[in-house]
């Protein structure tokens, strides 16, 4: 491969540094006597000048900081090397004398020739052949020296500690070809050697009997300086005319073709880069005579990247290369080229960022990505390269390839910008949409998508008719919004999804688009997995897939509240499509027997269950026949015998809802409505529901029966009327039961009575004016008189209502109140019932005498309309005022007498309890109240007026004063104990609030709480006296 075919970049920086003392007296590395050089660190250079003088040059100071004579005058230094930054190794030769290797410690360099750390004298006879190459191990334990006569000497020993060494000849070339390359591997167990015709491998740890362990290349050898060693890979690099070969310590070889016919020197820069020096011939530009024209030799410097097959640096040096050496700083390799003109070229790799920018400028993005990967560039920087590459490809019109690059840089690219490129700026052709879909897929799979991204992806998939893509989305995108590589099957039972606030995409919009694209089954699967609203799934099953049976099965699998919600919304539609199955489910829900079932529906499998038998729908006229048929045919899980048996003795887990919420669904289904209402009524007693709700069912069922009696076939008219009569009788019983039970609310069935009166086939409708009230009452002994009267006010004559009032007014207390409001509601009604006299006699007089209404309520009732005049109640008001005046006077007299009596008792009590005033006790002609004998001292006088002999009384010790005698009046003892009991009772009333609460909440107390409160106040509930009687 020719060099011209390799891509070239300037990825290294070359800085020529001329000797700052060039042309002066104290030359540094431009000294013409310079014979060897080595580097310690980027700031310290060691050179050998004048054959045997070693100088330490500080490059940053441009001065020699130390120098000394290292060898005798007849020796010349030909080799310098720094080992591990600790030792300096110098090799010097002298014709006719053994060559010397001296080791110095860098921290203790000598000042004169005789001082050194250790020395090795090469045993090479009279040393008539000069040394060509030297290699030293990193620990100074092994040194190999090659000569131009083909001899190799191996030196082993503890040289770093100056403990002696041994040396032996490991090879002598039979053809006396010079040793052109010699390198020890990293652990000094093997030595690579090369002559001008062969490449050899020696084992340094054993006896090789003067023969190589392995001949690596028997056909080609190396020129001097055309071999190097790569410590990073532990490989020997051989630069041949057409190849560059790499050998490992085991002899394995790999190579690549490279045209280096004018090679001159090779040096390993780092793991992947090799510096090569080649010669080029140029024509001088001086204006001298033609005869004096001669070719000019110049050196071209290449740094090749053996890994990526590129040229990383290319420049020309017009002078000879004296030596090449390297060091490192901050992890960066620094290579130095020392030339004969006193210029030292400092070669360093450019920063990775600069290298990549140089490559990007040449639009070689794949190589830039490759280089970034090799050097472990940060992920964000790599993504920036992908972004630039994507922009480049997009401009070139390679949309698919650009999309692939944008997918690789999701963290640095502006998502809206990419979407705009493929969706807005571009014509929405299928290819652009597919590219946009690929990009959106990558957002989702990397969990950086937002709600709009997921929505847009589904829209694109729908537009592309990509059924497989939508199916993949449903299978792998779970209910937590996370993409999974495997198919997600276990999150459908995760109920926490329904209580979360997750909203991954616009489900309503996607379902609408699927509906327009006729993706029926996919829309169901999508809604089943991601919809939190069961109504959406039912709508798809019912209206899109037209599968009411499966819709009912799905509704059965929901909790009771969701089931009820679906039934309220779709029961009308379900009753039209599948009436019996729907009715069975409604009965189960509204009778408290519903329990959710499992739902595993295969949309591809035909469901054979349902309401169809030989394409004819069965119609039922009662709940009993419906229940028997469903059991016998096994068409409903809800009504099966096993289900009925399991629910027979089982308490409901929820309170059945009011059936009235689905009444509107049965508008066109009267027979199904009959079955539903009868089922609800049959199970009503089991759940102790409200009587008002039961009355609603009775009223609705009654009206339904009467309507069917008018509109159904003649064969069933009598049955409907018979059922209506039974429902009316049951309603009257309910009204009577509620009226007799004081704890429950009253039940109003007036609407049923109104329906009965309005029914065209009832007896009352045929002759309204001849209604026989007595007969009606006899037929309905448990009827609600108040509801009946209200119903009569709507359909009967006022005179008929008055007759009803005369007959039942004394039985129902509120009947007179309702009648009074009715008779004065309209002037025509007032006139027809008889006017003022009849109202006074038949209505007002019974109210006043029976005290059914306060006078104020009577006045309010009459004043609501302008029918009644003041003269109607004038006499009543006058009589009331007189009665009240008489009552007031009587109460005033009672107050005066009570006040006088209270004052007398207070005075007497005050005198009695006053112990400080002396009390005069008359003893003359007094007898003892106990023995009835004449009194003689000592006596005991009580303030109640009773007096006794002291010996006639029983003595008791005072609990407060032990020395004081305590006596109690025998005659007043009973009254005293009674007073004490009353006093204790008052204390108990004050301290025990639960007594008051119990009294207020009792049946009697709840009727008149004011009476309970006043009674407790009278018993001293607020305050009490501490006076001891």
From Swiss-Prot:
Zinc finger regions, RING-type: 928-973
SUPFAM superfamilies for the chain: RING/U-box, WD40 repeat-like
InterPro entries referenced in this protein's UniProt entry, alphabetically: Clathrin_H-chain/VPS_repeat (IPR000547), VPS11 (IPR016528), VPS11_C (IPR024763), WD40/YVTN_repeat-like_dom_sf (IPR015943), WD40_repeat_dom_sf (IPR036322), Znf_PHD (IPR001965), Znf_RING (IPR001841), Znf_RING/FYVE/PHD (IPR013083)
Pfam families in alphabetical order: PEP5_VPS11_N (PF23341), TPR_PEP5_VPS11 (PF23356), VPS11_C (PF12451)
Segments of skewed composition (Basic and acidic residues): 644-653
Annotated Gene3D superfamilies: YVTN repeat-like/Quinoprotein amine dehydrogenase, Zinc/RING finger domain, C3HC4 (zinc finger)
One of the protein's GO biological processes: histone catabolic process
CDD domains (UniProt xref): RING-H2_Vps11
Record-level GO cellular component terms: CORVET complex; cytosol; early endosome membrane; endosome; fungal-type vacuole membrane; HOPS complex
Note: Present with 1200 molecules/cell in log phase SD medium.
Quaternary state and interactors: Component of the homotypic vacuole fusion and vacuole protein sorting (HOPS) complex, which is composed of a core of the 4 class C Vps proteins PEP5/VPS11, PEP3/VPS18, VPS16, VPS33 associated to VAM6/VPS39 and VPS41/VAM2. HOPS associates with phosphoinositides and the PX domain of VAM7. Component of the class C core vacuole/endosome tethering (CORVET) complex, which is composed of a core of the 4 class C Vps proteins PEP5/VPS11, PEP3/VPS18, VPS16, VPS33 associated to VPS3/PEP6 and VPS8. Interacts with PEP3, PEP7 and VAM7.
PANTHER family associated with the record: VACUOLAR PROTEIN SORTING-ASSOCIATED PROTEIN, VACUOLAR PROTEIN SORTING-ASSOCIATED PROTEIN 11 HOMOLOG
Function: Required for vacuolar biogenesis and for trafficking of hydrolase precursors to the vacuole. Mediates transport at the vacuolar membrane where it may be responsible for tethering transport vesicles on the target membranes. It is required for gluconeogenic growth of yeast. Acts as a component of the HOPS complex that acts during the docking stage of vacuole fusion. HOPS is an effector for the vacuolar Rab GTPase YPT7 and is required for vacuolar SNARE complex assembly. It remains bound to SNARE complexes after vacuole fusion.
Protein name: E3 ubiquitin-protein ligase PEP5
Species this protein is from: Saccharomyces cerevisiae (strain ATCC 204508 / S288c) (Baker's yeast)
């Amino acid at each position: 491969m020719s060099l011209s075919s390799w891509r070239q970049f300037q990825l290294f920086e070359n800085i020529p540094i001329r000797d700052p003392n060039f042309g002066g007296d104290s030359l540094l590395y431009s000294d013409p006597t310079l014979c060897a050089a080595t580097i310690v660190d980027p700031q310290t250079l060691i050179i050998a000048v004048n054959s045997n003088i070693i100088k330490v040059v500080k490059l940053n100071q441009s001065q020699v900081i130390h120098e000394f004579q290292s060898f005798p005058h007849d020796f010349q230094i030909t080799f310098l090397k720094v080992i591990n930054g600790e030792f300096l190794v110098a090799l010097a030769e002298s014709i006719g004398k053994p060559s010397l290797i001296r080791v110095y410690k860098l921290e203790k360099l000598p000042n004169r020739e005789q001082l050194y750390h250790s020395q090795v004298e090469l045993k090479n006879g009279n040393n008539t052949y000069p040394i060509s190459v030297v290699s030293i191990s990193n620990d100074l334990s092994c040194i190999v020296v090659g000569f131009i006569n083909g001899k190799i000497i191996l030196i082993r020993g503890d040289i770093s500690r100056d403990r002696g060494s041994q040396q032996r000849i490991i090879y002598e070339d039979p053809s006396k070809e010079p040793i052109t390359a010699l390198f020890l591997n990293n652990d000094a167990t093997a030595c690579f050697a090369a002559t001008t015709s062969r490449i050899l491998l020696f084992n340094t740890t054993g006896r090789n009997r003067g023969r190589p362990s392995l001949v690596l290349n028997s056909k080609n050898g190396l020129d001097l300086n055309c071999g190097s060693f790569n410590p990073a890979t532990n490989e020997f690099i051989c630069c041949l005319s057409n190849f560059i070969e790499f050998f490992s310590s085991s002899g394995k070889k790999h190579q690549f073709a490279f045209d280096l016919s004018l090679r001159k020197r090779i040096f390993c820069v780092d793991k992947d880069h090799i510096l090569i020096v080649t010669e080029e011939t140029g024509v001088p530009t001086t204006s001298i005579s033609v005869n004096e024209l001669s070719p000019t030799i110049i050196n071209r410097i290449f740094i090749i990247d053996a890994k990526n097959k590129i040229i990383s640096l290319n420049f020309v040096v017009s002078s000879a290369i004296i030596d090449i050496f390297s060091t490192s700083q901050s992890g960066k390799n620094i290579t130095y080229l020392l030339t004969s003109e006193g210029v030292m070229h400092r070669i360093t790799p450019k920063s990775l960022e600069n290298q990549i920018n140089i490559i990007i400028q040449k639009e070689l993005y794949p190589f830039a990505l490759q280089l970034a990967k090799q050097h472990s560039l940060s992920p964000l920087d790599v993504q920036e390269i992908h972004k630039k590459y994507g922009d480049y490809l997009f401009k070139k019109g390679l949309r698919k390839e650009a999309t692939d690059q944008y997918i690789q840089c999701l963290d640095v690219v502006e998502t809206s910008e990419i979407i705009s490129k493929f969706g807005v700026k571009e014509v929405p052709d299928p290819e652009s949409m597919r590219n946009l879909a690929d990009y959106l897929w990558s957002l989702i799979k990397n969990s950086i998508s937002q709600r709009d991204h997921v929505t847009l992806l589904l829209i694109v998939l729908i537009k592309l008719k990509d059924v497989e893509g939508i199916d993949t989305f449903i299978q792998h995108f779970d209910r937590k919004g996370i993409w999974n590589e495997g198919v997600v099957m276990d999150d459908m039972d995760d109920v926490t999804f329904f209580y979360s606030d997750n909203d991954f995409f616009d489900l309503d919009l996607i379902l609408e688009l699927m509906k327009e694209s006729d993706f029926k089954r996919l829309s169901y699967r999508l809604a089943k997995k991601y919809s939190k609203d069961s109504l959406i799934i039912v709508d798809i099953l019912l209206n899109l897939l037209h599968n009411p049976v499966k819709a009912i099965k799905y509704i059965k699998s929901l909790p009771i509240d969701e089931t009820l919600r679906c039934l309220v919304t779709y029961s009308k539609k379900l009753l039209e499509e599948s009436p019996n199955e729907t009715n069975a489910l409604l009965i189960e829900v509204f009778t408290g027997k519903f329990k959710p079932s499992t739902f595993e529906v295969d949309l591809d499998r035909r469901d054979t269950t349902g309401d169809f038998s030989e394409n004819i729908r069965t119609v039922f006229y009662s709940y009993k026949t419906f229940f028997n048929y469903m059991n016998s045919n096994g068409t409903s899980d809800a009504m099966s015998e096993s289900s009925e048996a399991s629910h027979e003795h089982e308490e409901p887990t929820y309170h059945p809802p009011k059936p009235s919420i689905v009444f509107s669904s049965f508008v066109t289904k009267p027979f199904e409505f009959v079955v539903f209402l009868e089922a609800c009524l049959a199970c009503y007693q089991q759940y102790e529901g409200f009587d008002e709700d039961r009355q609603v069912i009775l009223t609705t069922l009654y009206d339904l029966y009467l309507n069917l009696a008018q509109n159904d076939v003649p064969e069933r008219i009598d049955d409907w009327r018979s059922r209506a009569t039974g429902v009316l009788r049951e309603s009257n019983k309910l009204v009577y039961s509620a009226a007799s039970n004081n704890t429950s609310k009253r039940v109003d069935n007036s609407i049923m009575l109104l329906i009965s009166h309005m029914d065209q086939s009832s007896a009352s409708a045929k002759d309204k004016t001849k209604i026989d009230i007595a007969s009606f009452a006899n037929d309905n002994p448990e009827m609600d008189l108040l509801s009946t009267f209200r119903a009569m006010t709507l359909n009967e004559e006022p005179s008929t209502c008055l007759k009803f009032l005369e007959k039942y007014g004394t039985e129902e207390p509120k009947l007179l109140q309702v009648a009074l409001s009715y008779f004065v509601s309209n002037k025509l009604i007032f006139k027809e019932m008889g006017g003022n006299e009849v109202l006074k006699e038949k209505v007002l007089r019974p109210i006043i005498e029976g005290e059914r209404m306060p006078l104020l309520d009577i006045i309010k009732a009459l004043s609501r309309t302008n029918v009644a005049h003041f003269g109607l109640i004038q006499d009543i008001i006058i009589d009331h005022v007189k009665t009240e005046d008489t009552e007031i006077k009587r109460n005033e007299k009672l107050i005066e007498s009570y006040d006088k009596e209270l004052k007398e008792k207070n005075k007497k009590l005050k005198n009695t309890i006053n112990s400080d005033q002396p009390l005069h006790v008359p003893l003359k002609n007094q007898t003892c109240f106990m023995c009835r004998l004449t009194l003689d001292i000592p006596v005991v006088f009580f303030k109640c007026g009773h007096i006794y002999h002291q010996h006639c009384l029983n003595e008791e010790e005072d609990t407060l004063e032990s020395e004081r005698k305590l006596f109690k009046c025998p005659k007043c003892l009973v009254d005293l104990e009674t007073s004490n009991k009353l006093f204790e009772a008052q204390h108990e009333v004050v301290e025990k609030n639960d007594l008051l609460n119990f009294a207020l909440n009792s049946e009697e107390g709840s009727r008149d709480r004011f009476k309970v409160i006043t009674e407790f106040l009278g018993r001293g509930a607020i305050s009490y006296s501490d006076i001891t009687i």
